Amino acid sequence: MTPPVDHDAIVVGAGPVGQFLAAELQRHGMETLLLEQRDGTAETRSRSGSAPNGRAIGLHPPALAALEACGATERILEEAARIERGAAYDRARRLATLDLSVLGARFPFAASIPQHTTERAISASGPAALRGARVTELAPEPGVVRVSVRTGVRTHERTARAVVIATGAAGRDLALPFTGFSLHEYPDRYLMSDAPAALDPRADDRTAIITLDRRGVLESFPLAGGGRRLVARITAHADGRPDRTAVDALRRAVAERAGSDALAAAIGSVSPFRIRRAIVHRMRLDPAGRLFVIGDAAHEVSPIGGQGMNLGLLDAAGLAPLLAARLRRDDDLDVALRAWEHDRLASARTAARLGSLNTALGRARSRAVHAMLSAGIPAAMRTPLRRTLARAYTMGFDRAAERSRPDQAGP
């Protein structure tokens, strides 16, 4: 007999992944409590300046398709910039252009939108989060998971038939009593700026630009509402000169690699960041299938490639109907849940490999190697590799995307 519980499900973490899972569970008829440690929403933190501008901005076609059912996609696309193509440059010389519509996907573009806007669009479909609620312990038992929650100075217990950790990487400790994980720290350092007034003279506002410079990569992405996100790999002493400030370093990198002083001058505040890869060994954390971990808490991949948040959204899209069916029938659904876990971990490893490849391609290189790379890219883009790259850079190799491809659909 199932013991009495407070909720069908508890989702820990009200970022975009946690909010989406809670919305989908609610859409499938599950009474769901959404807990968030932080007091404000991402939007209020962004306005106050307490949230870094190093937040995810890219939503790829599989994630846009997954968000459709709850109505979030329509709201997102009302405000997003649509990235329809990518272009590779060597300074001002265009090496190749990749049209994302070549795959014939439901959404032939990526959406560029601030993460707080994505969260707002998703939250309109789901339960309101209980904020300022920090989960300190999870205890799965037969038929129930006990959740210790601290609000202010008081700690109390909530119970649910299932609990999902969706805290982001900062809350991975909640999963560690139940699973190990592999971790790789990259040596690479980056500087990033969202510049609302920036115009990249090499392309229009629907084109993302990757500049392959021998000193390191420069990325230039359209922003919703205009402007550009600029990301450059840097060294501590670029060209033998110590960087005076992060702003100076990024402006210099943009001017040298893009060949545009005007683009460099548009840079204001700058955020430094480093990257790492972490993947848990298991996403289903207990044998009974009542405790799970998804999103960045489960798999953290290099943001060079922009797939991290999308991975988590696809985790949630696949888990929600299975978990709802399991709770509705009080049935283990062991085979289906194991298949979901296998697919999501495989997709995380694929995204991690792609991120590692992008990271390696973005590193400084000798003049000879750079010349070979610049000569090889135009030739490669005249081969079937063009479609393969389009799939790779729109998350087409994610297991969820592969199952929904038009050429894989049944009659």
What do the PLM-derived regions correspond to, one by one?
Residues T2-V17:
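Beta1/beta-strand and adjacent pyrophosphate-binding region of the FAD-binding site
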Residues V5-H7, V153-A162:
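Core beta-strand elements of the Rossmann-like FAD/NAD(P) dinucleotide-binding domain
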Residues G13-R27, I122, I267, F273-L357:
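Conserved mid-domain beta->alpha element of the FAD-binding
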Residues Q26-R55:
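Glycine-rich FAD pyrophosphate-binding loop
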Residues R45-S125:
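Active-site-adjacent segment of FAD-dependent monooxygenases/related oxidoreductases
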Residues R131-V145:
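A conserved short coil-to-beta-strand element within the FAD-binding core of flavoproteins
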Residues A162-I275:
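Conserved FAD-binding catalytic core of PHBH/FMO-like flavoproteins
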Residues L322-P411:
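C-terminal helical "tail/cap" subdomain of flavin- and related membrane-associated enzymes
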